[in-house]
Amino acid sequence: METEERDFKKMRIAQVAPLYESVPPVLYGGTERVVSFLTEELVRMGHEVTLFASGDSVTNARLVPISEQALRLDPKCEDQLAHHVLMLERVFSEKRNFDIIHFHIDYLHFPLSRREKVVNVTTLHGRLDIPDLQPLYQVFHEMPVVSISNSQREPLPNINWQGTVYHGMPRDKYPHFEGGGKYLAFLGRISPEKGLDQAIEITKRAGMPLVIAAKIDKADQKYFDDVIKPLLDSHLVEYVGEIGYPEKFDFLGNAAALLFPIDWPEPFGLVMIEAMACGTPVIAYPYGSVPEIMKEGVSGFIVPDAQSAAEAIKNLDKIDRKKCREYFEKRFTSARMAEDYLAIYERLIKGQAAPIPHSEGALSWTKSA
């Protein structure tokens, strides 16, 4: 399913990761996991990669440890921003060692990058429909940025977009499961926008068990206690807490489907392609990136509400799990992701940093989807 790798000149690349989780994360952490997949693929392709991350990160690149461990897991850490400022100082002190610096920490570095005149690019991993971001990106409009879906761009269409690069994962890391299980899966984070209450409603309407593997941030504890916890008394619902990376394979691969009933403009949704990699179809609400990532009837079903989702569950036997896996291999591998980023790096290093119009912003692999 993979196309032949393009030949790129060997580059010296810095990857600058958030410090909240290790790279890769032990448990939850979509951004850090994607940074890991990208970093390891770039190393495999022969590039000289330096990773700025927490000290408990594991990589084949040169690791520059900033904090002793992931900040979310460090009970002694009271000011996470302080560690990120220290990281920026370290990154820019080594700027001459890199052909390009790839940031994954949103806009935190913008004032320094503007003044230091380094070749850089930033992947924006979060939602952009926040009013506070409008004046910030008006001021820093020249900063080259990458979107992780075309829908993510919509609130800020006129900034310096260099392309859309969908996330990718190693094709050999996720085993393909031939047969579907007898339960529905919910994986990720428990918060209002992730739609766990909707997932529970779907499972009750469908009469099929739901297994929930998800973390609860401190900010969402009240939501869990007030809204979700009372819904867990159903015999159809089992909450197993947060699970690690190896456990994900069996959890997703043995599920009948992944439920993704979000209520927000999801920038990407890594868990969707994790499920597809295991051959497990996804039943998702049509918000944010979902229509871009999903292929109706191949990787699952896009539905508008809980009743439609319950009806879709009856049609899961129409999904060919092998074709679901093949769809992942065609569009969402880490090799494809790395090549797309290398094309952007190459263009920026050559001084070609003009914005790419939205119609051209999706790289070639999205046009044939």
Language-model-derived ranges and their functions:
Residues 2-369:
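Catalytic cores of nucleotide-sugar-dependent glycosyltransferases that transfer UDP/GDP/TDP-activated
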